Amino acid sequence: SAWGHDFRTDYQALVILKRRFELVPLLALTATATSQVQRDIKEMLGLRLCETFRGSVDRKNLFYEVLEKASTLPEACQQVHNWINDSFRMGGVTGPGISNSLGTTPCGLVYCFSKKETEQVCEELRRLGISAMYYHADLEHQDRSKVYELWCSGKIRVIVCTVAFGMGIDKANVRFVVHFTMAKSIENYYQ
């Protein structure tokens, strides 16, 4: 599966607990894992006799929009800038159940394929007036933490990132996720 090799090492180590304390119950939760990923998780955690409960991945509060991307990076960044500003100038991104009723500034993520692209897109969005910072695996831990804290506190509006950012994020005023580059798999869109 897509998570097989890069599955968080801390989670992979949980199998040690299962082996050492066989009678202690273990619960694995995921919001978007495919059947194959679920099988991988069960195998990695040593869960042989277990119950699986699934809900629908159809989220009524999400909508998808596909736009043709401009051919140059500056033009594509201008498109993202315009889309973000146009969407929120009208009181919120259009779509079922999406609003800014929390009274906080809407924020979001712009996913890029490479670390280099995150830096280039971030620089261009900042030049266009969007408060943004980039996030990727080559940043020092303290720098990644700082970006996350600034975003969570509302001091920056957009994180331009690779897939190194995103899993486990729970921020109430996230109103958009832009894939600047096509995701590798449909799983990445759900994440």
Regions found by a protein language model. Give the residues of each.
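Helicase motor core with emphasis on the C-terminal RecA-like subdomain
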Residues: S1-Q191
